[in-house]
Amino acid sequence: MDNSIVEENGNSSAASGSNDVVDVVAQQAAAAVGGGGGGGGGGGGGNPQQQQQNPQSTTAGGPTGATNNAQGGGVSSVLTTTANCNIQYPIQTLAQHGLQVSIWGPGAWCQLSSVRCYGSQPEVATKDVQSVIQANPSGVIQTAAGTQQQQQALAAATAMQKVVYVAKPPNSTVIHTTPGNAVQVRNKIPPTFPCKIKPEPNTQHPEDSDESLSDDDSQHHRSELTRRPSYNKIFTEISGPDMSGASLPMSDGVLNSQLAGTGAGGNAANSSLMQLDPTYYLSNRMSYNTNNSGIAEDQTRKREIRLQKNREAARECRRKKKEYIKCLENRVAVLENQNKALIEELKSLKELYCQTKND
């Protein structure tokens, strides 16, 4: 298994030199029989008590620290520290099986919630083990000894050289065992900002597929297609009967070339369209443009004549209407005069009748 661990919390742990992530690799306690530890790749080693006295100690060798004898017991430990990492959290449970693991990093509370072994053996969950970190950064915190169940789980994981995950909610500690019987502990200090989970790189989100379109979008798309003008209808109206015969050979030639190209593949279809005879295609296009311009001029001229006739007819209609109104007005005036004359004549006749009757 790869020893490197990548944890994403919004900022990459390998992008900055002042990370809150520390790596502690404690080699097997059996190396103490040889009488000393081998040298690491940096200058941040030393006794844990010496590390506590220097709160700003950093390693110059990158991810690998110095190696020395710690606690006077001949146990070899490899320490890797970064800035402001000087607190030791020894896990006594692993020390009983020949391994000493120390977790270095700032913090005020640490809780080991569960230990699980992933392998051919069944999964074993242990009880919570709590440890309190002193407020003083130089304080040393000792974790309470684990139960017999925890020891069995850790011993089984060490013997099988499998992965043991120690879940710590505040610090997210993960322990890996390597083929060399070394334990790598990566202590992650919780960030002060909310974590973001990146999506899987293999996950595909099709955006242009037909399935991703909703019913409203599909209906709107179909309505737009139905509202689009029919270019074939416009072409037939403009071209007329003479152009229909001329346009058919060109469309047949393009259709035949497309069918031939489709049998050979999509690229062949595109190449066949591009390999058409330019003289054949351009000749039809030129004739189409010439006839189209003549037909357009003819239609424009006919439209102008029709509009002129309509204007003249409307003008004549308005003139006749005015004349008719004038005739009606004159006739009304004549009839009024005649009515007055008849009324006067009637009066005179009545007077004459009255006079003759009296006589």
Curated annotation (Swiss-Prot):
One of its GO terms (cellular component) is nucleus. Keywords: Activator, DNA-binding, Nucleus, Phosphoprotein, Transcription, Transcription regulation. Disruption phenotype: RNAi-mediated knockdown in the mushroom bodies results in a reduction in long-term memory performance, but does not affect anesthesia-resistant memory (ARM) or learning ability. Pfam families: bZIP_1, pKID. The modification Phosphoserine is found at S209, S212, S214. PROSITE patterns: BZIP (PS50217), BZIP_BASIC (PS00036), KID (PS50953). Residues 33-47 have a biased composition (Gly residues). It comes from the Eukaryota. Most cells of the adult brain; cell bodies, but not neuropil. Gene3D superfamilies: 1.20.5.170. Residues 328-349 are annotated as: Leucine-zipper. Residues 1-73, 185-238 are annotated as: Disordered. Homodimer. This is Cyclic AMP response element-binding protein B. The lineage of its organism: Eukaryota, Metazoa, Ecdysozoa, Arthropoda, Hexapoda.
